[in-house]
């Protein structure tokens, strides 16, 4: 499994290759915040003043650093993304692949950045900045957002394009009469039980987004003394849905904690028409060498 040391080496190489003051400043700040790949609105404003650039120009300059977080043992193809929240915060994302598992377990960079922002408490994404044109899977995933109609996509070669330009005549949650969509506040009530890690899994399951299957699902990881959670984000097209273990592993990686050992994994699911138990158990065993503790609530 790639280590934090490998991430640091990649970033150092990018800094040397780019020889760009923005890249250097971003890398320095990442090191100061222990490689937690989220930047406050205040930090973003400071850089915009310092380098006399817009939010989008700043995010475009950040892409080579964001791509350093990629985990790509299969493709060796590094994709970096920056989701800009309506709060003004920047959230990095990167693609992640898992050996010895079905390729459907892959995390796309746009999914990574969006899930990162969602778990961090962001309320909407205004802009998605990415170093390669979004694939159809990601275009459909972004169409689930509460900001889908106004979301702008920015690439190194083309900026200020609305999502609908990449996904004309789209199919989405409104076609299935879903009013509260991804990033809208969800209100579900699940009974708490068990120890703190189990309770965390239940609480994060209650915050998941599953309007089609009604199968709420959450994961809690014991990472040293910290609990890191991930939750399910469903999609109107079903296949682009984002699974809770990927969500948790992604958040751990982007929090700069990929070196910290995971000692336990708890999954909580409500009884619905689907289950992510088997896929999550397979990934937990092959990628982490751990048994997944499962509860139905």
From Swiss-Prot:
Q: Per its UniProt record, what CDD domains does this chain match?
A: cytidine_deaminase
Instruction: Enumerate the SUPFAM superfamilies for this protein.
Output: Cytidine deaminase-like
Subunit and interaction comment: Homodimer.
**Annotated Gene Ontology cellular component terms:** cytosol
Q: Which PANTHER family match?
A: CYTIDINE DEAMINASE
Catalytic activity of the protein: cytidine + H2O + H(+) = uridine + NH4(+); 2'-deoxycytidine + H2O + H(+) = 2'-deoxyuridine + NH4(+)
RNA-binding as a keyword of this entry, yes or no, is no
Q: What is the lineage of its organism?
A: Bacteria, Pseudomonadati, Pseudomonadota, Gammaproteobacteria, Pasteurellales
User: Where does the source fall among the domains of life?
Assistant: Bacteria
**Binding positions for substrate per the UniProt entry:** 95-97
Q: Which residues form a coiled coil?
A: none
Q: Which InterPro entries match?
A: APOBEC/CMP_deaminase_Zn-bd, CMP_dCMP_dom, Cyd/dCyd_deaminase_Zn-bd, Cyt/Deoxycyt_deaminase, Cytidine_deaminase-like, Cytidine_deaminase_bacteria
Q: What organism is recorded for this protein?
A: Actinobacillus pleuropneumoniae serotype 5b (strain L20)
Identify the EC number(s).
3.5.4.5
Its cofactor is: Zn(2+)
User: What is the cofactor note?
Assistant: Binds 1 zinc ion.
* Protein name (Swiss-Prot/TrEMBL): Cytidine deaminase
**Family label:** Belongs to the cytidine and deoxycytidylate deaminase family.
According to the UniProt record, what class of enzyme is this? hydrolase
In what residue span(s) does the CMP/dCMP-type deaminase domain sit? 54-174, 192-297
Instruction: Give the GO molecular function terms.
Output: cytidine deaminase activity; identical protein binding; zinc ion binding
Q: Which Pfam families match?
A: dCMP_cyt_deam_1, dCMP_cyt_deam_2
Alphabetical GO biological process terms: cytidine deamination
């Amino acid at each position: 499994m790639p280590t934090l040391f490998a991430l640091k080496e990649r970033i150092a190489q990018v800094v040397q290759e780019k020889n760009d003051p923005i890249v250097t400043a971003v890398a320095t700040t990442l090191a100061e915040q222990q490689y937690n790949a989220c930047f406050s609105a205040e930090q973003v404003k400071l850089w915009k003043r310092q380098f006399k650039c817009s939010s989008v120009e700043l995010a475009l300059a950040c892409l080579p650093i964001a791509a350093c977080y990629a985990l790509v043992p299969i493709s060796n193809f590094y994709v970096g993304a920056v989701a800009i929240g309506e709060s003004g915060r920047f959230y990095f994302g990167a693609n992640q692949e898992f050996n010895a598992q079905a390729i459907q377990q892959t995390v796309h960079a746009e999914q990574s950045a969006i899930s990162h922002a969602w778990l961090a408490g962001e309320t909407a994404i205004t802009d998605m900045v990415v170093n390669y044109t979004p694939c159809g899977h990601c275009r459909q995933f972004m169409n689930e957002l509460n900001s889908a109609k106004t979301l702008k996509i920015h690439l190194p070669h083309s900026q200020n394009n609305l999502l609908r330009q990449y996904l004309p005549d789209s199919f989405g949650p409104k076609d299935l009469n879903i009013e509260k969509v991804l990033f809208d506040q969800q209100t579900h009530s699940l009974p708490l039980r068990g120890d703190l890690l189990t309770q965390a899994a239940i609480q994060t399951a209650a915050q998941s987004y599953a309007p089609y299957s009604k199968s709420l699902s959450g994961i809690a990881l014991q990472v040293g003394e910290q609990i890191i959670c991930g939750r399910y984000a469903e999609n109107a097209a079903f296949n682009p849905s984002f699974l809770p273990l990927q969500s948790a592993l992604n958040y751990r990686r982007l929090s700069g904690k990929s070196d910290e050992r995971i000692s336990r994994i708890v999954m909580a699911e409500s009884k619905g028409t689907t289950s992510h138990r088997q896929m999550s158990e397979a990934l937990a065993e092959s990628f982490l060498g751990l048994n997944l503790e499962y509860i139905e609530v």
